[in-house]
Each structure stands twice: as structure tokens, then as C-alpha cells.
Amino acid sequence: MKFSQSLIALAACFLPLIAAAPVEAQHAKIRSPRAQDIIPDSYIVVFNKGVNDADIESEFSSVSRILSKRRSAHKGVGHKYNITGFKGYQIETDTGSIGEIAASPLVAWIEMDGKVQANALETRSGATWGLGRISHKATGSNSYIYDGSAGSGSTVYVLDTGIYIEHSEFEGRAKWGANYISGSPDTDENGHGTHCAGTIAGATYGVASKANLVAVKVLDRDGFGATSATIAGINFVGQNGKDGKSVISMSLRGHYSAAVNSAVESTVSNGVTIVVAAGNDGDDASNYSPASAKNAITVGSVDSTDTRASSSNYGSVVDIFAPGVNVKSASIGGKSAFSIKSGTSMATPHVAGLAAYLIGLGGLSSPAAIASKIASIGTKGSVKDPKGSVNLIAYNGNGA
């Protein structure tokens, strides 16, 4: 399964990388995805599928010897990824060392690490139409019709700028999970993650108002991070999430990355539903990750007239559309503060919340079943200008 004042808003922009020519020349395993920024001397090393723990430990010993031999001043091995079907690590080192590491028979490929950037989003006072839209087949309703289970028993992991967990919208149901931004406090200093979390499970503006929320911080106060940190966040959920009861919401995007897609696809295969933004580039979403990950649920944005937002990415990898223009939700301005934001970043949490809502109803035990249900009950044929995308708007199956 298959985004400035920039383009109205995405949460973030993966900008993976252009490899330096000397590195490419040293080994064909080193990949250089499309990019506009790079993190110098930082790499994501992916092991072959099926590699065992003993071989991995032996490999780390070998890497230590390589770094020691070259007397590298870099930090060395950082994040380690241990998802069934996706194992690897992030390393800071020089080009000579990475060439030696790439030569290992245990290494499938290496990607240069990339920056992640969160764009500023527009805010203003406005209406609350998104919940009305996903609980009715037609536009125009501001009432939200839903089952009282409201996502009870589900947990949504928000990979973003963090969550202001003290906000009244969360009623104590939000907690801190992990922080992959070095030196950053365990709170949301930006506001993007809190807004997304409010749409997912806020008491007033949330789709699944009884679901639990876990903050996984992969973007800093200025909206910057690294591809490697985002994969570390996915790995955290893979290690801590409960199969069939967990959802990842990723309102971020970047140019196509095999490492990001592989981590997403492996985590879904292990029982975690992953909902991702199509992106705000007005472009084919297949050019971006994690939007192009095969078994993620990829979400485009529509406005209150069911017209695809002009900035919303589109195409065959988009699985569904959801409200993403002028969406009201929680903000970091205070425990009762709210703001209005727009973008596929805002559409994505509507569908992540819907996945949690369906888990709360019971009877759906796998990501495939949840995705199938979302597709089968969605409002068909209402999207204006889908531009080659599926013509489907998220719907919870309740209102007329």
C-alpha cells in the first residue's frame, strides 16, 4: 500500500542524500538516494535478511577494529535497528572506513544519512469540520458520530516533534516513549506532533478519544532530524508495540529511501499498522518515502469541499484521502490551547485515529485487515481532482 510558508504544510521533509563520488567508487553497495541535503559522514548500514545475532555481534567487533585501525575521530556506531526483517545500524565514520564496512558479506546495502525538516504551518481561527467529514458520507456536518469504544485498548505511536503530554486534550492518556534528538528535552518544542496527536486521540478533536498515545521524538524544535533517527523511532515501536493493537502515525516525508521503506514494510509485517503522509509537493507520491512503502496506508489531503488540496501528493500509492485543510487541534501554547493547521500532515492523523478506532471496535487483528476495512468503508467517488489517485475519503461507518 501503498508534503512555504512552503507548500501548505507537511510535518517534515526527509532529504536523503547524494553520495560523494569517492564513496560510490569504493563499493557498489553504497546507495545515494535523491537529496538536497546530507549529513556528512553518517550512514545507515542494512544487513542481509536472515542474518543472526551472533553474526551481527561479530560484525560490530569487525567494525570496531576498522575504526581503531584508521584512528577515526568520528563517533562510530549509533542507533541499532533490530526489526524482524530489517536489521542494521547507523554509523558516523569516514569514507575510507565505510568502504571497508560495505565489503562485508553481511551487509546488504548502505545509504547515506539525510536531514529531516519540518516546514512551518499556517495557523488561524476556523471551523472544526474534519471529524464531521469522516463520520458522514456527505460534506457539511460539524457533528461527529462514533462508537463509544473510541479506540479503547489501542496505542498510537506519534513519530514527530514530540507531544505536549500535559495538554488537557490527552486526559493522561499520552506518555513519553523515546527521544532520538540528542540534547532535546522530552517535550514538544515545535507543536507539530502535539497537533497531530490531538487529531488522533484528543478528547475534543480526536478521532479515537480513548486511545493511548506515545511520543517518539525524531524531529527537533526547529523541525530538523535525520533519516537514521526516524528509522530508530520505527525500531522502537517494533520492539515495544503490541501486535494488532499498535499504530504508527508518520506525518513526514522525504525522497525515496529503500532503508525507510524496508523498515516500514518489515514493521507492518510484524503486526503494527503504519499510516503515513503522501507529502505536500503536488507531485507523484511514489517518489517519496515513507509514502511509497508498499504496505503503509498512505494519506492524501482534501478540503471541506472534498477537493484534493493543490499541494497534496497523488498517484497510485495513495490509499485514501482525509481532511487536511484548516484542521483544528491541540497546540503547545498552554494546556487548553488550540491552533489551525493544514497539509497531508493533518490528514494522516485522521486515518491513524481511524485505525485505532477500528482496533477499539474489535475483530480486526492485523494491519492488512485494518487497511482493508478502511478501504472498504471509505466514501467512494467524492474526491474532486484525485489526479490518478484512488477516489476514496476516510469514513468511520457511522453517520449518513
Swiss-Prot record:
Top-level EC class: hydrolase
Signal sequence coordinates: 1-20
GO cellular component: extracellular region
Matching InterPro entries: PCSK9_ProteinaseK-like (IPR034193), Peptidase_S8/S53_dom (IPR000209), Peptidase_S8/S53_dom_sf (IPR036852), Peptidase_S8_Asp-AS (IPR023827), Peptidase_S8_His-AS (IPR022398), Peptidase_S8_Ser-AS (IPR023828), Peptidase_S8_subtilisin-like (IPR050131), Peptidase_S8_subtilisin-rel (IPR015500)
EC number(s) per entry: 3.4.21.-
Domain Inhibitor I9: 42-117
Subcellular location: Secreted
Domain Peptidase S8: 128-400
One annotated GO molecular function: serine-type endopeptidase activity
Main location: secreted
Listed name of the protein: Subtilisin-like protease 1
Chain residues in the propeptide: 21-119
Family, as annotated: Belongs to the peptidase S8 family.
